């Protein structure tokens, strides 16, 4: 009986020692907002606020059309929170999530910015600081975000970020 108790105690101590020496790794995950796309009636207000902000900060506006039901839209949001992408977004863009409901809401905004929602969501459009359309997705490029790498989002953001303002020190701007 003493032998069994001794072996049990030795096993517990050995497991405790192993656990203490096992390196731990931490994984940082970006929480996905359940309501990524605000109430559909808020889109016009958010767009007007973005236009004001962009005009004063000289940022571009990134319109993200989608719905809270859309898994690929949530993947895009995770990619937006990738440190490299988040830095570009925060410093160069004003992001507006446009809730399209179940392809039946805010269709006038999508039409105004030439975004063919029938090609799928998420769908993106880029406006300059004055609200002029610079780019709209025509072929559902981000419709299958689950198959796209975060680097593709980085490439897109870099392609459409505004030019850096000319410094007064630079002669040939």
Predicted regions mapped to residue ranges:
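Structural alpha/beta surface segment adjacent to cysteine/selenocysteine redox centers
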Residues: 101-121, 127-130
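A short beta-strand-turn-helix
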Residues: 39-61
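Non-catalytic, surface beta->alpha helical segment in thiol-disulfide oxidoreductase systems
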Residues: 119-166
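C-terminal motif of bacterial Sec signal peptides marking the signal peptidase cleavage site
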Residues: 15-17
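Thiol-based oxidoreductase modules, predominantly thioredoxin-like and allied folds used
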Residues: 78, 82-107
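Conserved redox-active cysteine motifs that mediate thiol-disulfide chemistry
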Residues: 65-80
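Bacterial N-terminal signal peptides that target proteins for export
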Residues: 1-8
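Bacterial signal peptide processing site
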Residues: 19-21
């Amino acid at each position: 009986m003493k032998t069994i108790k001794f072996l049990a105690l030795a096993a517990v101590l050995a497991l405790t020692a192993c656990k203490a020496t096992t390196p731990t790794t931490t994984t940082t995950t970006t929480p996905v907002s359940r309501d990524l796309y605000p109430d559909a009636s808020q889109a016009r207000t958010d767009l007007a606020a973005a236009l004001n902000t962009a005009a004063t900060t000289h940022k571009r506006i990134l319109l993200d059309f989608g719905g809270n039901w859309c898994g690929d839209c949530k993947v895009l949001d995770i990619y937006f929170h990738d440190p490299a992408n988040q830095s570009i977004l925060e410093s160069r863009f004003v992001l507006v999530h446009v809730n399209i409901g179940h392809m039946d809401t805010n269709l006038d905004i999508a039409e105004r910015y030439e975004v063919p929602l029938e090609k799928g969501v998420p769908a993106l459009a880029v406006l300059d600081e004055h609200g002029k359309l610079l780019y709209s997705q025509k072929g559902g490029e981000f419709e299958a975000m689950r198959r796209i790498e975060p680097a593709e989002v980085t490439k897109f953001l870099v392609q459409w970020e505004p030019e850096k303002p000319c410094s007064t020190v630079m002669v040939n701007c």
